[in-house]
Swiss-Prot record:
It holds the Pfam family KilA-N. Residues 20-129 form the KilA-N domain. GO terms for molecular function: DNA binding. PROSITE patterns: KILA_N. This is Putative KilA-N domain-containing protein L33. InterPro entries: HTH_APSES_sf, KilA/APSES_HTH, KilA_N.
Length: 246
């Protein structure tokens, strides 16, 4: 199928690649859009922006951040879909169409992380939207006044400080694979939401490479009435001490 320019806004050009994909281009910067769902090829976009700024910024790096993980959780809740459905991997077809496609709502968050300039522009666009109508203004201030702090980060910090007071040691100990929540004379401690227990065990094993003589300890919060049997089996098998902190 031959390419054709479908529409143009000032210097922004939209090109139909085929019936499914469209390329949106501004000068030498472009994005690939999946017309079926509006998802955008974030792999390609991050690569292009990284070359422009001379510093590698990848989607994988963004996704590893604690804040990013919580943003993904919140987006899934708002859209009423599973987290997995926010991402689509395209591994076949023309090379330029391959990569990780993500929900358009996440694209703004990723580029916000990459570019302070873009973040500032988004803030001003929101301000423009707020001023457009009293209804918009009401929605804005309602969201602003009811904004919830990061539960995971807040709770982790509370537990971290209590354990530091109890056991002593050092918090946020930096390693090549991440930061240890709390390290004492004989323990490396990871604090995690129940639903992220697998991540926590993986982190403990990564940290234990640097501190092989220290005991691996996992503190879980937000457990409630959830089943711990499988977690206990895994922890026992891999010599991880499990504690519940609810």
């Amino acid at each position: 199928m031959s390419k054709k320019i479908s529409r143009s806004i000032d210097t922004i050009i939209f090109v139909d690649i085929n019936s499914r994909y469209t390329k949106c281009q501004y000068c030498d910067i472009y994005i690939i859009i999946d017309n079926e769902n509006g998802y955008i090829n974030i792999t390609s976009l991050c690569s292009i922006i990284s070359k422009k700024i001379g510093k590698e910024k990848t989607f994988k790096q963004w996704k590893k951040n604690k804040t990013s993980k919580e943003q993904v959780e919140e987006m899934a809740k708002l859209e009423k879909i599973s987290e997995k459905k926010l991402f689509i991997d395209i591994c076949s077809g023309p090379k330029k169409m391959q990569g990780k496609y993500i929900h358009p709502g996440l694209v703004t968050l990723v580029v916000h992380w990459i570019s302070p300039e873009f973040a500032a522009k988004v803030s001003l666009w929101i301000e423009e939207w707020r001023r457009y109508s009293s209804n918009n203004s009401d929605k804005y201030y309602e969201s602003l006044l009811t904004a919830n702090p990061s539960y995971n980060s807040q709770r982790e910090k509370e537990i971290q400080e209590k354990l530091l007071g109890k056991y002593g040691g050092e918090i946020e100990v930096e390693t090549k694979t991440g930061r240890i929540d709390l390290m004492t004379n004989d323990k490396i401690i990871e604090i995690k939401n129940y639903y992220k227990w697998k991540n926590a065990i993986g982190q403990l094993f990564a940290y234990s490479i640097y501190y092989p003589d220290k005991k691996k300890c996992l503190y879980l919060f937000n457990v409630g009435t959830n089943d711990l049997n499988e977690i206990k089996k895994v922890c026992k098998k891999y010599d991880v001490k499990l504690k519940v902190y609810d």
